[in-house]
Amino acid sequence: MNQVLTETRPIRLKGRSFLAMVLSPELPLDGWLELLDDLARRSSGFFLGRPVVLDMENLAIERAQLVYLLQALNDRGVWIMGVEGARPSLLGPGMPPAMRGGQPAADFEAPAGEPQANPGAPEPQISQAVRAPGHAVHAMPSMVITEPVRSGQSVYFPEGDVTIVGSVASGAEVVAGGSIHIYGTLRGRALAGTAGNTSARIFCRKLEAELVAIDGLYKTAEDLEPRFRGQAVQLWLDGDYMMIDTLS
């Protein structure tokens, strides 16, 4: 019997860029967690299966408070894949790893356009961590989906506009760096302008959305005026306010 000697194959290490949410907690933590609970209640499944990075850069807390926060998020089904901006003494065994070099794009922050129960309370801030372009892009690329987006499916295209020739089902999600055009019913979530594009818009033939967001400003189904539901509409930003109007 002949013995065949083979060379050990080297381990191949590759670099890839992935899309993740970034949560920026604020003090007091219990108050911020209540706001997070409200967001999760108004948009069911928003954090389900999402990798999330915790932004600690502007949060002055001690390790015990961080442990409490991580446990509270875990209890809510929010999976923290890493911590950014935390001083080394805060992190320890059993905690998510420290992350560096994140390039946040647009913040998902509730607009101040409509009165809230407590208008002085800060809203939880969420952002999309994406690869930022190195130079200004004048002609944004686009993606066209020629079939409906079904429940549980997600369409991510941070480079430009997304057009859906069909409907977006409840529990589905469309995320675009530019505008979103839906030639059907929007029942799920549509997040436009995630690359910091304040001129992005959302268009749909029939509005039944769970959540809409443009450049960080979001509205849930409860925030949308009833007279716009079931209508063909467009949404856009005017400063820090999200505007909505019917399509003629």
Swiss-Prot record:
<dbReference type="InterPro" id="IPR005526">
    <property type="entry name" value="Septum_form_inhib_MinC_C"/>
</dbReference>
<keyword id="KW-0717">Septation</keyword>
<comment type="similarity">
    <text>Belongs to the MinC family.</text>
</comment>
<dbReference type="GO" id="GO:0000902">
    <property type="term" value="P:cell morphogenesis"/>
</dbReference>
<keyword id="KW-0131">Cell cycle</keyword>
<feature type="region of interest" description="Disordered">
    <location>
        <begin position="94"/>
        <end position="126"/>
    </location>
</feature>
<comment type="subunit">
    <text>Interacts with MinD and FtsZ.</text>
</comment>
<dbReference type="GO" id="GO:0000917">
    <property type="term" value="P:division septum assembly"/>
</dbReference>
<dbReference type="Pfam" id="PF03775">
    <property type="entry name" value="MinC_C"/>
</dbReference>
<keyword id="KW-0132">Cell division</keyword>
<protein>
    <recommendedName>
        <fullName>Probable septum site-determining protein MinC</fullName>
    </recommendedName>
</protein>
<dbReference type="InterPro" id="IPR013033">
    <property type="entry name" value="MinC"/>
</dbReference>
<comment type="function">
    <text>Cell division inhibitor that blocks the formation of polar Z ring septums. Rapidly oscillates between the poles of the cell to destabilize FtsZ filaments that have formed before they mature into polar Z rings. Prevents FtsZ polymerization.</text>
</comment>
<dbReference type="InterPro" id="IPR036145">
    <property type="entry name" value="MinC_C_sf"/>
</dbReference>
<dbReference type="GO" id="GO:1901891">
    <property type="term" value="P:regulation of cell septum assembly"/>
</dbReference>
<dbReference type="InterPro" id="IPR016098">
    <property type="entry name" value="CAP/MinC_C"/>
</dbReference>
